[in-house]
């Protein structure tokens, strides 16, 4: 051997059993990496050495056992009982046994090398026999478990004269003093090698060198199949399994296969429920030591991995790698089924289960199955109610650490992830990725029933339950069932009244962070979502999506009861309650019940008098933001929605839809009392109140009652004299916007409503309906007292007042409708007293 040349033994690292057991799983992985990397560097320097047996075993991720024959066991009969056979081969009279290095040395002195059969036997034996002076080193490098010396040897371990430096802690010898100093740091815990980039410290210099590659981005180990590069050889070896797809180790419990025995062992602990590694901080247990180490970083708050783009810090290096792909847009893992690409292999594996439909993890409580174990673990918290992670700001608890971290960003108001398309910021990279799909219009998830496409898988799941009608999540308070767990969680806040998210501008509180974010855009006036058809801008993407359907006319959701179509599934669900008549939301003030919770909230503001939304033009305040938006159109005069039939324009799409039903003549909503049809359900609801005679709205001034709140508002203006709506043509003022709209037709002379029977035109749709009944002869309004029928509800009202005053006025008979005018004076006198 040439003096000064480097051999594999010069760079090999040895461990005793005591040392090996002190190492954490990630440190054992480091050993594999270091040994493989050292060998790789020697080859790259031009060393013409054959591959050591230990390298072959490490590449295959096998344990390097020593193999002993039965002949040896006759000379040393207590070997088998002392150390135990690992594998017996009756044909060759051979068994595997785990021996300490000094026992191997002692046996080889007595019986020679023929007592042993080494793996890769001929190759290893020739090298071993050629290096008699290095027997101990070659066997020691194979990570053989180190035991106490058995009684039969009667000798101390033989120490090589080339290793004069002894460790006083464990008795291990080293050839260099520097190696001894490095080794002693294992016992002392000293970490003298510090990274200048992030400050992290290490026990060994090789660990620091490996770590620095994360900062430099150096990736010297490249896959020949796909060209992907890695920092470490073990990473490359694991990656190669993706291409070979060898899975030799199968779980007997669930049939799942693995390409490494260690992965199978780790997986089997899931079925066994064994979790020997417990956190001293919070008591949480894990089935792997590496998982415990990762978990403990949550308590220490250590985040050594920093992104150079946005300076965001992470606990784990894999999190930094995943995060960096948000900036680069790299998605190296592609699904062969639908061509969708992912930033991480784990996400691809998770996605592929959607196509396979595989769900091996089942909940023992309710039988629900999941494709991933972490999904099952999250689901279990529903049954246990456990929420160990608490926010120090507001006291809210979560069942997952990631949810707590996401929640805390709401308080910190940190939004490091910015969309390059529209500039919107997000506190999570996942939210940015979801948001970017809005701009790309990508919708890879398609419903098999109706072929409707969705951007996200959860939207598809939610949509499918419209077809199946499945609602597995039930509220224990009121029994209401929901198709999604998030809907149930949102609903529960109605009962608890909890609203932890408060607006700093106006103090209004919300039960969801997303609602607060939506609300804050009211103060900023930001409207980033613009319609490409008409240029109208919206605060929320949902509003834009709804608006776009007005241009396309798309209505995929059909009511099976009456055949009506809707643009949104939520609108269909709301509509269904009309047929069922169910009204689960009741006002505690007046007992009035509502079909929807939002209707109850709107109603309650009438009792409280709360009007937080004020018009900057005229100072008028409103209880709802939508009311303010409608009001603003009075000042701007904007009417973007135009009827194609008659050219009339409207400031709201709902008004246009309502108007179009006049031309179509469609009236799907029929009153069960009198059979009258209506084009809108709200009109039917208003009409039904005429039959019930309920008048819940009372004037505080004169105690007069009204069926509708708008009637009370209109009536108040009689007392106050307020007339806020002024005609710009003649200056005349009105108490109601509808009165102003009717008046303005006088100036324009517009009469868009034409009778098909006689051709007569009218400036109001209600005026058209009245003469049409002349042609049809229809009289739907009947007096319950005398059975007389009328064409118009106004005629019925006047008739009922005549009947009411008949006795006090000594009126014996009420004749034809022409008699009404002759009695008006008497009615007026009676009413005024």
Curated annotation (Swiss-Prot):
Zinc finger (C2H2-type) residue ranges? Answer: 165-187, 193-215, 221-243, 249-271, 277-299, 305-327, 333-355, 361-383, 389-411, 417-439, 445-467, 473-495, 501-523, 529-551, 557-579, 585-607, 613-635, 641-663, 669-691, 697-719, 725-747, 753-775, 781-803
Listed GO CC annotations = nucleus
Q: Name one Pfam family in it.
A: zf-C2H2
GO MF terms held by the record: DNA-binding transcription activator activity, RNA polymerase II-specific; RNA polymerase II cis-regulatory region sequence-specific DNA binding; zinc ion binding
Concerning InterPro entries, the annotation shows: C2H2-ZF_domain (IPR050752), KRAB (IPR001909), KRAB_dom_sf (IPR036051), Znf_C2H2_sf (IPR036236), Znf_C2H2_type (IPR013087)
Fetch the SUPFAM superfamilies from UniProt. beta-beta-alpha zinc fingers, KRAB domain (Kruppel-associated box)
**Which of UniProt's keywords are assigned here?**
DNA-binding, Metal-binding, Nucleus, Repeat, Transcription, Transcription regulation, Zinc, Zinc-finger
Q: Superkingdom of this entry's organism? A: Eukaryota
**What GO biological process terms are annotated to this protein in UniProt?**
regulation of transcription by RNA polymerase II
Localization in the cell? Nucleus
Q: Residue limits of the KRAB domain? A: 6-77
User: Could you tell me what this protein does?
Assistant: May be involved in transcriptional regulation.
Q: Which family does it belong to?
A: Belongs to the krueppel C2H2-type zinc-finger protein family.
PANTHER family for the chain: FINGER PUTATIVE TRANSCRIPTION FACTOR FAMILY-RELATED, ZINC FINGER PROTEIN 519
What is this protein's record name? Zinc finger protein 780B
The gene for this chain is ZNF780B
């Amino acid at each position: 051997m040439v003096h000064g040349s480097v051999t594999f033994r010069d760079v090999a690292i040895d461990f005793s059993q005591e040392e090996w057991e002190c190492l954490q799983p990630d440190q054992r992985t480091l050993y594999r990496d270091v040994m493989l990397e050292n060998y790789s560097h020697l080859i790259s320097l031009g060393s013409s050495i054959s591959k050591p047996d230990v390298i072959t075993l490490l590449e295959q991720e096998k344990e390097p056992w020593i193999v002993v024959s039965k002949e040896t066991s006759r000379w040393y009969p207590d070997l088998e009982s002392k150390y135990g056979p690992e594998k017996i081969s009756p044909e060759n009279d051979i068994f595997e046994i785990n021996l300490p290095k000094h026992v191997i040395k002692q046996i080889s002195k007595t019986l020679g090398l023929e007592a042993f059969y080494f793996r890769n036997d001929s190759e290893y034996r020739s090298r071993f026999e050629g290096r008699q002076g290095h027997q101990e080193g070659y066997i020691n490098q194979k990570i053989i478990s180190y035991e106490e010396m058995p009684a039969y040897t009667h000798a101390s371990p033989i120490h090589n004269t080339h290793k004069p430096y002894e460790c006083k802690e464990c008795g291990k010898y080293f050839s260099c003093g520097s190696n001894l100093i490095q080794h002693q740091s294992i016992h002392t815990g000293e970490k003298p090698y510090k990274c200048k980039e992030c400050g992290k410290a290490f026990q060994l210099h090789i660990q620091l060198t490996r770590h620095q590659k994360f900062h430099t981005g150096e990736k010297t180990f490249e896959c020949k199949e796909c060209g992907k590069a890695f920092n470490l050889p073990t990473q490359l070896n694991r990656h190669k399994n993706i291409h070979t797809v060898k899975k030799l180790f199968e779980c007997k419990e669930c049939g799942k296969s693995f390409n490494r025995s260690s992965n199978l062992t780790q997986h089997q602990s899931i079925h066994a429920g064994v979790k020997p590694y417990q956190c001293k901080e919070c008591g949480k247990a894990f089935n792997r030591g590496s998982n415990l180490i990762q978990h403990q970083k949550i308590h220490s708050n250590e985040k050594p991995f920093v992104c150079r783009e946005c300076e965001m810090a992470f606990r784990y290096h894999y999190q930094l790698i995943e995060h960096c792909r948000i900036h680069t847009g790299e998605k190296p893992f592609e699904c062969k089924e639908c061509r969708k690409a992912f930033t991480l292999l784990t996400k691809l594996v998770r996605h592929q289960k959607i196509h396979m439909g595989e769900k091996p993890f089942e909940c023992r409580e309710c039988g629900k199955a999941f494709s991933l174990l972490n999904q099952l673990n999250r689901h279990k918290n529903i049954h246990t109610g456990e929420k160990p992670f608490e926010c120090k700001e507001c006291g809210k608890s979560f069942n997952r650490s990631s949810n707590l971290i996401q929640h805390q960003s709401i308080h910190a108001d940190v939004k490091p992830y910015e969309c390059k398309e529209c500039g919107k910021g997000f506190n999570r990279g996942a939210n940015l990725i979801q948001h970017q799909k809005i701009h790309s219009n990508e919708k890879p998830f398609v419903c098999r029933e109706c072929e409707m496409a969705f951007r996200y898988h959860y939207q598809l799941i939610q949509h499918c339950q419209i077809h199946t009608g499945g609602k597995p999540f039930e509220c224990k308070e009121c029994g209401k069932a929901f198709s999604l767990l998030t809907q149930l969680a949102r609903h529960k806040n109605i009962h608890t009244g909890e609203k932890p998210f408060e607006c700093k501008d106006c103090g209004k509180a919300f039960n969801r962070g997303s609602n607060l974010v939506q609300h804050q855009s009211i103060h900023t006036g930001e409207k980033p979502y613009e319609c490409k058809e008409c240029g109208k801008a919206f605060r929320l993407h949902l509003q834009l999506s709804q608006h776009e359907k007005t241009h396309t006319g798309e209505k995929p959701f059909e009511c099976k009861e009456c055949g009506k179509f809707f643009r949104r599934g939520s609108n269909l669900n709301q509509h269904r309650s009309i047929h069922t008549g169910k009204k689960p939301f009741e006002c505690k003030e007046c007992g009035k019940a509502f079909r929807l919770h939002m209707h109850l909230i709107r109603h309650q503001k009438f009792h409280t008098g709360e009007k937080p939304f004020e018009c900057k033009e005229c100072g008028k305040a409103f209880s709802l933001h939508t009311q303010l938006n409608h009001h603003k159109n009075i000042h701007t005069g904007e009417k973007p929605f135009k009827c194609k039939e008659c050219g009339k324009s409207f400031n709201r799409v709902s008004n246009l839809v309502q108007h179009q039903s006049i031309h179509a003549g469609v009236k799907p909503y029929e009153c069960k009392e009198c059979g009258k049809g209506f084009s809108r359900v709200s009109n039917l609801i208003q009409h039904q109140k005429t039959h019930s005679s309920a008048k819940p709205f009372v004037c505080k001034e004169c105690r007069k009652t009204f069926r509708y709140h708008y009637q009370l508002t209109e009536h108040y203006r009689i007392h106050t004299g307020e007339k806020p709506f002024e005609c710009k043509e003649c200056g005349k003022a009105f108490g109601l916007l509808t009165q102003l709209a009717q008046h303005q037709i006088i100036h324009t002379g517009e009469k868009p409503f034409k009778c098909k029977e006689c051709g007569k035109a009218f400036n109001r749709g209600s005026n058209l309906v009245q003469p049409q009944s002349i042609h049809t002869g229809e009289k739907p309004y009947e007096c319950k007292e005398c059975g007389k029928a009328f064409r118009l509800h106004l005629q019925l009202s006047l008739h009922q007042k005549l009947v009411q005053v008949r006795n006090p006025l000594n009126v014996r008979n009420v004749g034809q409708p022409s008699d009404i005018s002759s009695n008006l004076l008497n009615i007026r006198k009676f009413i005024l007293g």
